[in-house]
From Swiss-Prot:
GO terms (BP aspect): cell division; chromosome separation; DNA replication
Region (Disordered): 193-219
Entry keyword set: Cell cycle, Cell division, Chromosome partition, Cytoplasm
Record-linked HAMAP family: ScpB
Highest taxon of the lineage: Bacteria
GO CC aspect terms: cytoplasm
Name listed for the protein in its UniProt record: Segregation and condensation protein B
Protein encoded by which gene: scpB
Record-linked InterPro entries: ScpB_csome_segregation, WH-like_DNA-bd_sf, WH_DNA-bd_sf
Quaternary structure note: Homodimer. Homodimerization may be required to stabilize the binding of ScpA to the Smc head domains. Component of a cohesin-like complex composed of ScpA, ScpB and the Smc homodimer, in which ScpA and ScpB bind to the head domain of Smc. The presence of the three proteins is required for the association of the complex with DNA.
Function of the molecule: Participates in chromosomal partition during cell division. May act via the formation of a condensin-like complex containing Smc and ScpA that pull DNA away from mid-cell into both cell halves.
Organism: Symbiobacterium thermophilum (strain DSM 24528 / JCM 14929 / IAM 14863 / T)
Length: 219
């Protein structure tokens, strides 16, 4: 295969794929061994590092995706406004607890949050950000929840170890704070998303994350 033709095909695959492309999958589709597929990807990544390019190739969730460059984010946001429905504060807080304490049961999440999390869990399951990780060996064998590959993709992470360090204060229900700020680009993005407080109350109601905490329900 002519090398430039291979890069053209790889570029098309990255654009068309609904999920991060692994080197193994690229090799299978194009008909290369994995070593050559990795070299092809590295070469294409260099092409996208040129300052005039509006797109970049990022490694996340065990594969590669084609994304817009951070420098163009302001203009992309203008194009896409009004923004697609985001996650409510209740859903984000629940997701943060699951991400840092997984695998974890519903009762354990509610113990940390101090409110019921039924609707938040339903929202996160529908979005594919969390999944059933099995059953806990305890009375009633409750479901254990954990994050998914979609969670990594949603926050632009390669692996869970890139999550920013936090403290979950069980003495004050719902208190989850970063232990430090800054870090790499991915870490800053996750901090901004998980700890920014979510959408306004009207948006929370829209995605099933609203409720009255005074009645022991989701916020």
């Amino acid at each position: 295969m002519i090398w430039n033709h291979g890069k053209m095909i790889l570029e098309a695959l990255l654009l068309a794929s609904p999920e991060p492309l692994t080197i193994k999958r690229i090799a299978e589709v194009i008909g290369l061994d994995e070593r050559d597929a990795a070299l092809l990807m590295a070469d294409l990544q260099k092409d996208y590092e040129a300052p005039h390019r509006g797109l970049a190739i990022r490694e996340m969730a065990g594969g590669y995706v084609l994304t817009t460059r951070p420098e163009a984010a302001e203009y992309v946001e203008r194009l896409l406004q009004p923004k697609s429905r985001g996650l409510s504060h209740a859903a984000l807080e629940t997701l943060a607890i699951i991400a840092y304490r997984q695998p974890i049961t519903k009762a354990e999440i509610e113990n940390v949050r101090g409110v019921k999390v039924d609707r938040a869990l339903e929202t996160l399951l529908e979005r594919g950000l969390i999944e059933d990780k099995g059953r806990k060996e305890a009375p009633g064998r409750p479901i254990l929840y954990g994050t998914t590959a979609e969670f990594l993709r949603y926050f632009g992470l390669r692996e869970l170890s890139e999550l920013p360090p936090v403290e979950i204060d069980t003495s004050e229900p719902g208190l989850i704070v970063p232990t430090r700020t800054g870090g790499g680009e991915a870490e800053r993005e996750v901090q901004a998303s998980l700890f920014a407080g979510g959408e306004e109350p009207s948006a929370e109601a829209a995605d099933g994350g609203a409720g009255e905490s005074t009645h022991g329900e989701e916020e």
